[in-house]
């Protein structure tokens, strides 16, 4: 069984003006596709062939891990975004954020700050730890919470390819627009899982 590039949950131009169709074409159509292609080439004829993406991530290292994790991370990222989304969360997500960070405004400020200052790392995540508390963590390269006991709820990709076409070197601008796209329904499903 080989992996395929998962379909985007929206049209390539659906996130404009926050993320352009051109950025999606390169980020999804080139970067994400390359990780899928590389992973398939690396696992062909190995013990990883036929395993799920999550099984590969939890039991591999090196190039296999990097490509598998990037496929998973990017798929998760695309699902964290939605057109006509954003705003503040409601329900259980709002309650969990308030319990862990004091308020949505405090969480948003801390998450944005972590992502802006994330120069050694490439992904910033909101996770639910095994004790039920929410936390903001950053992972480097292809790092993913799947290798820990934390449950990923939300992520932002802060590799330059995620924003350079639209925002050049202005990562804060990208983060400001990210909040207009956050798919809180997806976050709620992850929290409930």
Question: Each predicted region: which residue ranges?
Answer:
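Feature for soluble, non-membrane regions of globular proteins
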Residues: 1-193
């Amino acid at each position: 069984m080989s992996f395929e590039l998962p379909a985007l949950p929206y049209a390539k131009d659906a996130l404009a003006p926050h993320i352009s169709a051109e950025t999606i074409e390169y980020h999804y159509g080139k970067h994400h596709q390359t990780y899928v292609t590389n992973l398939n080439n690396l696992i062909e004829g190995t013990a990883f062939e036929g395993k799920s993406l999550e099984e590969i991530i939890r039991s591999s290292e090196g190039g296999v891990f990097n490509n598998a994790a990037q496929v998973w991370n990017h798929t998760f990222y695309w699902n964290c975004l939605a057109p006509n989304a954003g705003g503040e969360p409601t329900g259980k997500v709002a309650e969990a954020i308030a319990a862990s960070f004091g308020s949505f405004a405090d969480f948003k400020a801390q998450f944005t700050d972590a992502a802006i200052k994330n120069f050694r790392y490439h992904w910033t995540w909101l996770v639910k730890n095994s004790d039920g508390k929410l936390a903001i963590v950053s992972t480097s390269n292809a790092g993913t919470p799947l290798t820990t006991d934390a449950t990923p709820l939300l992520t932002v990709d802060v590799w330059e390819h995620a924003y350079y076409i639209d925002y050049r070197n202005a990562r804060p601008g990208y983060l400001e627009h990210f909040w207009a796209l956050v798919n809180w329904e997806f976050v709620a499903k992850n929290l409930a899982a």
